[in-house]
Amino acid sequence: MQCIPVNKQNFNYSTFKQVEYWLDRNSIVAIFPEGTVNENKDLTNTFHSGAVLMALKCKVPIIPIYIKRREHWYERLRYVIGEPIYLRDYIKGVPKIDDLISLADMLHDKEVELKAFLDRKLQKKEKKIYF
């Protein structure tokens, strides 16, 4: 496993080149588009557009994943994986900054949908009675 450091205060092009390097080698690159660990249970952190720009530049889909925050370290990790999103399908021509922001918002909305889906599944499971 490889880690690509990102300096949020002084972001530079070398990060894009490293992401491109690994994607060209069919590696999986996980990006948290909030830019930090999300401490909010209600997913109110906005997504940054860097992940969108990288996916467009490298011509790869984004596969949205929602990971439920655990209250305790011993709890089972719960997550849900969405369908791949091909961002190029949502824009025409050269992407503008408004396109990047709008696509980042769309990804955020998708994560909210995945959270709601997982919450519904877990609620149904909790209602079952075991003997």
Regions found by a protein language model. Give the residues of each.
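Non-catalytic C-terminal accessory region of glycerolipid acyltransferases
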Residues: 14-131
